[in-house]
Regions:
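Conserved AAA+ ATPase "SRH/arginine-finger" region at the nucleotide-binding site
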Residues: 1
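C-terminal helicase module of SF1/SF2 nucleic-acid helicases/translocases
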Residues: 4-19, 38-45, 49-194
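Conserved RecA-like ASCE P-loop NTPase motor core of nucleic-acid helicases/translocases
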Residues: 22-26
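Conserved core positions of repeat-based scaffolds
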Residues: 27-29, 37
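A short, hydrophobic C-terminal helix/tail in secreted or cell-surface proteins
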Residues: 195-199
Length: 199
């Protein structure tokens, strides 16, 4: 509630300027095991403040309902779209200018970059707000710091790889410290290659 009240003036301003907002949550429903924001609860909170202007989509919604909500967002009937990461790819709404990501420390670096890419497709400067709870892990703090420092997808992918590790290339492990005996698959960083091309 406190975070919502702090963001409220921005929401009102964006809506008054006929711009739209994505609000991303990591969970569909409230969980007793995970202390993360749910899309359903956030929808209820935001809808109380902006009645009949808020939509909700997530992976558990029927496709027809989801398509109807997205169509209402496209024609600007809905001003704020509360969603899980189902909007991560394949969504293009140039009028959506702001994205708010709840529990941003829960997401990976590349995923945050993908989500952030849902806005900034129009002619106005976009806004990305990363919300998180206190006591961030060192790794989570580093991810958010990187995201704040660059919009370059190649640099973000490289940093993400460095943070998560390569995992097991021939196995099932998708992250972890690399264990190469003869060669490092990333001996030259993308940044160095770009600098070499420029020179």
């Amino acid at each position: 509630e406190k975070k919502l009240n702090e963001i409220l003036p921005l929401l009102k301003k964006e809506i008054s300027l006929e711009r739209q907002i994505f609000w991303i949550c990591p969970l569909i429903d409230v969980s007793s095991n995970l202390n993360y924001t749910s899309a359903k609860k956030k929808f209820e909170q935001v809808n109380r403040l902006f009645p009949n202007q808020v939509g909700l989509i997530h992976g558990g919604i029927d496709k027809k309902i989801k398509d109807k909500v997205l169509q209402d967002f496209l024609i600007k009937k809905i001003k704020i779209l509360v969603s899980t990461t189902v909007i991560e790819v394949g969504i293009d709404f140039p009028n959506a200018n702001t994205i708010i990501i709840e529990d941003s420390n829960k997401f990976g670096l590349s995923q945050l970059h993908q989500l952030r890419g849902r806005v900034g497709r129009g002619n106005t400067e976009s806004i990305c707000i990363l919300l998180y709870k206190n006591n961030l892990s060192k790794n989570a703090r580093e991810r958010l710091k990187i995201l704040k420092s660059t919009n370059d997808g190649f640099i973000i992918a490289e940093k993400d790889l460095q943070l998560r590790g390569f995992g097991d290339i021939l196995g099932f492990q998708q992250s972890g410290i690399k264990n190469f005996k003869f060669a490092d698959p990333l001996p030259v960083s993308y940044t160095h290659l770009r600098a070499h091309e420029t020179a």
